[in-house]
Amino acid sequence: MKANKNQFYEGQICNATILFPTCSMCPSQGANNFLGYQPTYWQYMDKLVYWAGSASEGIIIPPPAGSTDAAHQSGVKSLGQVFFPPSAFGGRQEWVRQMLTKENGKYIYAIKLYEIAKYMGFDGWFINEESGGGSTSEWVDFIKEFNGIADANGDTQMEIQGYNAARSPNEAIVKSHKSTSQFLEYGSPDDYRNYADILGCTEAETFSKIYGGVQVVNSGHMGYTDALDWAMPVDGHGGSLALFCPEERIWKDNVKSLLGTKDECGENAYLAQRKTFYKERDMWVNQYGDPTYADDFGWPGLSGRMLERSVISSMPFETSFCVGLGKHRFVEGEKQNTQDWYHSGVQSIMPTWRYWIENKEGLDVSIDWDDAYNFGSSLKIKGKLTAGDHLMRLYKTMIPVTSGGTLRLVYKTSTPGSVEVRLATESKVKGEMVTLSNPTVTDKNGWTIAEYDLSQLNGKTVYMISLNMKSET
């Protein structure tokens, strides 16, 4: 189900992102301020690399648990960081030699890295090797040690992704294991399918093994159209991209002057974070906040080339439209706390399309932190309804309905009777849809709760969840 003509599925995005202002100041359970952030457009990502580590603060850094949870609920891999910096930034070859230590014929730190990832529930490691001191053959054997024990324990998704500032794939490294990948130097996005025979894999598998680097921290969050054109042209994908620290431009620029001040909470923080979410939208979707828009000339947004991913394939599925950030804490529509907060671990799966509204005509969708049913935010749709239907596609799904079930919609509206639920039973933009009717309706703390019986869909598959906003005049 394509939102625009230039979308394809094959190419992947690896997001090497900062998640905290500094490596050593990383709260495990969020904090009571309004400045925290992590990406919310997981539908355009395949892997998350926690970009952290420094010679003075630590070089082995597991990803935050909440971020791993948020990534996993959208089907995105989460990788920690082993950071061997260049000597100019304090890197030491002796650290690499220690990592490659063998005892009784085994790479003991490869085993330990697996044990850490297994215990903490993430999917492997990004090894930034710019210090030198190790040979290709040693790293190949190190990776084989890591994945050998992972495979033996059933963790076949475990991955090591390597980076050493090389502009072309290290064939021996990438061939180490079926899950091994490489982040190539900045300026290297291209079509790498011709490496399939060399790597002993299919062309389709090259997309998950070779990523062309894009230094977004320098180019800006909308400054790498050329990289998209090289790897993901409008007529089909040839390669994948690794984005280096887009959050520096999307988020950190907005909040860095507020960190550690009284403005970590309150109006200045709200203003800064509104800017963050606009910038995030501009990069992942486009400046119009509309994935149906295809710009063949300017910045197309990632949605202009990437087909949205979804893992929603069974019941129950629940979302509160929470971005992991709040001015208040809500429980069933009741405001129970007025302290600013953030916590990445309570982030909801946000809509697959942000936002795809047919017959839009001035309707605007935004994240509302002032009113919510649960957690800290809701979606607010604002504007005047013109006559007719205004279909808002929310979630791409593949949910088989075998024994009924219930769809529960919690909402507020100033126009009674204007909201209905439509479910697509074909995976087509213009495919068959079922409009749900006769809900059981209750009210709680000012919110309408509509519950729809799904037994009429038995034997069918739900491919999309949408809302239709309608008006007779």
Positions of PLM-derived features:
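Catalytic-core regions of glycoside hydrolase
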Residues: D155-W251
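Extra-cytoplasmic beta-strand recognition segments
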Residues: L379, L391-V419, A450-Y452, L467
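Solvent-exposed serine/threonine-rich low-complexity stretches and specific carbohydrate-binding patches
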Residues: V96-R97, K430-D443
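Short, surface-exposed beta-strand/strand-loop-strand elements in extracellular ectodomains
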Residues: G417-V429
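Extracellular beta-strand ligand-recognition surfaces/modules
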Residues: L409, W447-T473
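Chitinase-like catalytic core of GlcNAc-active glycosidases
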Residues: K5-Y195
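Short carbohydrate-recognition loop motifs
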Residues: G362-L391
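Substrate-binding cleft of secreted/luminal carbohydrate-active enzymes
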Residues: I210, Q215-L363
